[in-house]
């Protein structure tokens, strides 16, 4: 509880990835704990899954008791179950390692139970991969999002090597339950591998984005900002406001979004191209343009759960 974090994140390591000819050595643990709980030898895999379930459930419970606004998420291996492994054919049309059967990680169950707040499956394969096709998998995860926050884990190097960034972005953006992407590893973006950063900035991430609200955790927006005013300061022409804030109350304003609209255009805060600042400050220095052009600035407040308030508007001549 000492650190001001937004989320606790776990990667894809639960039970270890299986190695050929090396069964996981948990005989003693199973005899001591599994058999005592009523599991038979034939149910050892169920016992393993319940062990991981307990870990995930208790982590979520502990986070809720400590800082209820902190999110808990997982980036699991990209295949939940292959179709051939499921009696009802509910698995994906893939042929690879499986979370449920090999790592004993029941991802979709965790989402259903509300134990994780977001899911980032690692869909690191290419479009057309013979065992794990990218399109097949993102469609499967979208269909099985179960109302949770779903993001797609992207392998930067493999995507750029196959020249598939444009196609992948187009496909995932067409799916109704996908909220965005997580690019791995970050240094490939920083190094601009094959122009990936340029392409993202130019084509897909041209404007700032707001984090989707975690309404299953808290669904009431904070109070609107008040006393929205302009003032000349030694640093320039300042737009400033007041808001109710507290570091110990996640339902109050945590940060603010500043939008700018031309004088006659309709105000639409769902348009990200109008965002000029996302800030934790209660002021924004506006670019002064000889005082002849009319604009309308809109300021909203956002809480720790990313619920956004209604906007307050100020007409300004710049």
Region roles according to the model:
Residues 1-115, 124:
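Polysaccharide-binding and catalytic clefts of secreted carbohydrate-active enzymes
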Residues 280-285:
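Short S/T/G- and acidic-enriched coil/turn segments that sit immediately N-terminal to beta-strands
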Residues 286-308:
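Beta-strand-rich modules
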Residues 5, 116, 178, 222-225, ...:
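Core-facing hydrophobic residues within beta-strands of well-ordered domains
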Residues 199, 269-272:
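Coil residues (strongly favoring Ser/Thr
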Residues 199-250, 306-318:
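Pro/Thr/Ser/Gly-rich low-complexity, intrinsically disordered linker/stalk tracts
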Residues 104-130, 138, 145-218:
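Substrate-binding cleft of secreted/luminal carbohydrate-active enzymes
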Residues 244-270, 311:
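Solvent-exposed loop/turn segments flanking beta-strands in beta-repeat/beta-sandwich domains
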